[in-house]
């Protein structure tokens, strides 16, 4: 019996042999290879290949550093094949990581285990923070897992380096797009969303693609949106059917003069497997495209100002029940149905044409009583407990039926006065 190699060799009288699987003592000799950063984009990942004598599963443990609050990363894989490629995630940078592989039978009973070390390098990206210091941590209130940060670099056109930190503030996962010839120009504009299949998807606003990658950093899909007649803008999400929703511009769309190109006023639904466009919503047929130029006319060339082309500036889209919740920097927060019918709009009432007024929600004080001041309703001033969304972004429906959104503060009260420091602030609002 050869316990180390999980086999017993029977030798017959005629000299022939027959090998039968036998319970071994460890799985050291079942590990064929281990490779750190197999995709080239995730230096805190590894691939371990094992060859098992009989069907079974592998349970992985990535051990936390001694004295840390973050629990070990543990996962039992579903694969029961004889040869398995085990993805290892959650390694520490510049550290000789301790990994445990546990070989179980189909019922989950442990057969044997093995420990191995995986040495990682120092993270090199200049776009990562030089230091992460935990100021306050309430470990008993933290959800399991790690926190995803969409690191933008110094400019919106810089390569985005998304990473995850654990409860101790250590980086444990990263997508270093700069190491990829294919993706090194992906910016922060669309962030990074977790898909239902466990992969991640982002939109490349610099080269107008939609990219799906797995947790290791390997490319699954790379959809060219220009070939489909669109350029990427600011937001992507996934609906309950698995389709991708995205805010885009349509390259063939023109304003009323038939010459100037419209931008940032389309939403599309795309099949993430086939890359087919399943539906398109044109905001010109949903919102008031004549509602622009409300800010200081002396600042119409400013990038924060509106124009006939950039009248909406769509920047958020998510599914909400059977409908959709969207944001446009200059037009507010709105809910619409699959047919494109507007259910309601949260926006200052100023400058809307008459046919849209019935769609505008009325403002309330914090105690639920109606606000009656016409200037507050119009949006030309705030009151102590209410202000409209100004340059709103990324509205998210909450379990309690409320909406959480980011208020950028662009053009607050229809003014773009960047010298008025009291009027320039951003905030999250529920």
Tell where the protein language model's regions lie, with residue ranges.
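Histidine-/acidic-rich catalytic cores in large beta-rich domains
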Residues: 15-18, 24-58, 62-65, 81-85, ...
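Alpha-helix capping and helix-coil boundary motifs
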Residues: 1, 67-69, 369
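Low-complexity, intrinsically disordered regions enriched in charged/polar residues
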Residues: 3-4, 24
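Solvent-exposed serine/threonine-rich low-complexity stretches and specific carbohydrate-binding patches
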Residues: 70-80
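A eukaryote-biased signal for short, well-structured alpha-helical docking elements
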Residues: 6-17
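Compositionally biased amphipathic helical and low-complexity segments enriched in hydrophobic
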Residues: 2, 11, 31-33
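Surface-exposed, short loops/turns at beta-strand junctions within beta-sandwich domains
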Residues: 2-3, 88-96
């Amino acid at each position: 019996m050869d316990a180390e190699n999980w086999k017993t060799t029977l030798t017959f009288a005629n000299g022939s042999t027959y090998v039968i699987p036998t319970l071994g003592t460890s799985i050291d000799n079942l590990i064929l290879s281990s490779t750190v950063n197999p995709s080239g984009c995730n230096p805190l990942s590894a691939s371990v290949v094992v060859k098992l004598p009989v069907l079974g599963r592998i349970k992985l443990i990535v051990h936390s550093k001694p004295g840390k609050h973050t629990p070990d990363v543990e996962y039992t894989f579903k694969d029961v094949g004889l040869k398995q490629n085990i993805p290892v995630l959650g390694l520490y940078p510049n550290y000789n990581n301790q990994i445990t592989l546990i070989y179980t039978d189909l019922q989950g009973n442990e057969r044997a285990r093995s420990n191995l070390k995986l040495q990682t390098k120092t993270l090199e990206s200049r776009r990562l923070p030089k230091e992460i210091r935990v100021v306050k941590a309430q470990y008993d209130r933290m959800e399991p897992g790690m926190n995803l940060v969409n690191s933008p670099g110094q400019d919106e056109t810089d390569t985005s380096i998304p990473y995850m930190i654990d409860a101790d503030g250590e980086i444990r996962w990263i997508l270093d797009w700069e190491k990829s010839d294919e993706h090194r120009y992906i910016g922060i504009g669309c962030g990074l969303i977790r898909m239902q299949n466990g992969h991640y998807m982002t939109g490349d606003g610099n080269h107008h693609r939609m990219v799906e990658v797995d947790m290791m950093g390997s490319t699954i899909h790379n959809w060219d949106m220009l070939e489909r007649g669109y350029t990427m803008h600011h937001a992507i999400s996934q609906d309950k059917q698995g389709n991708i929703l995205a805010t885009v511009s349509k390259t063939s769309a023109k304003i009323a003069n038939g010459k100037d190109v419209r931008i940032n006023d389309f939403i599309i639904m795309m099949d993430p497997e086939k890359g087919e466009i399943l539906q398109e919503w044109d905001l010109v047929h949903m919102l008031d495209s004549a509602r622009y130029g409300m800010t200081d006319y002396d600042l119409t060339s400013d990038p924060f100002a509106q124009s006939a082309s950039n009248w909406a500036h769509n920047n958020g889209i998510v599914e909400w029940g059977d409908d959709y919740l969207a944001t446009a920097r200059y037009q507010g927060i709105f809910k619409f149905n699959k047919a494109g019918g507007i259910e309601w709009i949260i926006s200052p009432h100023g400058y809307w044409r008459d046919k849209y007024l019935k769609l505008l929600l009325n403002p309330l004080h914090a105690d639920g009583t109606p606000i009656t001041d016409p200037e507050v309703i119009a949006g030309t001033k705030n009151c102590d407990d209410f202000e409209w969304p100004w340059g709103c972004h990324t509205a998210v429906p909450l379990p309690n039926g409320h909406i959480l959104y980011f208020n950028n503060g662009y053009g607050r009260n229809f003014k773009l006065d960047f010298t008025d420091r009291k009027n320039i602030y951003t905030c999250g609002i529920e």
